[in-house]
């Protein structure tokens, strides 16, 4: 496991990174097809109310035991239910920021967000399930982590 305390800032994706399962796949497909903040909010509300997600337990453990500031970055529209889910998953004393980009261009805007943070935080770790986003961010000289390697039952 990587020591997250060695970094100045952690930038972490949510869907298919910290939480995963059928509903996160449905969220992804619905956002890509309809680009509807309202539909996204309804699906997030259902996940929040009925706990319709699985948590990447190893990643949760790493984040909860790190003192490094963390920003959760999502391409979806802003939703209070995203914040509620993160509060349920993380330890009560673990602070975080949530940044909802509401964009179709995550492969451009996520690395751009990291680039903007580099002036204040020279050592950043990006945790994201997207190969494209990790590759674009790694080109900036930022460390990246593929969270799929931390999932239970993952086989190489």
Which residues fall in each region the model found?
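Short, charged, surface-exposed secondary-structure boundary motifs
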Residues: 107-111, 153-156
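Short, aromatic/basic amphipathic alpha-helical patches
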Residues: 83-92, 117, 135-141
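Residues at the starts of beta-strands that form the adenosine-phosphate
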Residues: 69, 123, 143
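Alpha-helical substrate-recognition element adjacent to the catalytic core
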Residues: 2-107
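Conserved Lys-Pro-Asp/Glu-containing loop-to-beta segment of HAD-superfamily phosphomonoesterases
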Residues: 109-132, 137
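Acidic, PIN/NYN-like endoribonuclease modules and their adjacent C-terminal/linker elements
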Residues: 138-156
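Short beta-strand/turn micro-motifs composed of small residues
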Residues: 74, 127-128, 148
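Conserved beta-strand scaffold positions in the cores of enzyme catalytic domains, especially
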Residues: 98-100, 126, 144
């Amino acid at each position: 496991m990587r020591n997250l305390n060695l970094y100045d800032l952690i930038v972490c994706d949510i869907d298919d990174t910290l939480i995963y399962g059928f509903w996160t796949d449905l969220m992804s497909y619905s956002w890509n097809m309809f680009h509807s903040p309202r539909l996204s909010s309804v699906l997030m509300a259902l996940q929040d109310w009925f706990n319709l997600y699985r948590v990447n337990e190893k990643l949760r453990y790493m984040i909860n035991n790190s003192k490094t500031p963390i920003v959760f970055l999502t391409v979806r529209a802003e939703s209070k239910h995203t914040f509620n889910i993160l509060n349920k998953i993380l330890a009560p004393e673990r602070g975080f920021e949530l940044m909802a980009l509401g964009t179709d261009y995550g492969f451009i805007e996520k690395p751009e967000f990291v680039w903007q943070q580099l002036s204040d935080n020279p050592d950043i770790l990006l945790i994201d399930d997207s190969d494209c986003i990790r590759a674009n961010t790694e080109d900036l000289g930022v460390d990246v982590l593929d969270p799929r390697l931390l999932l239970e039952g993952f086989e190489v």
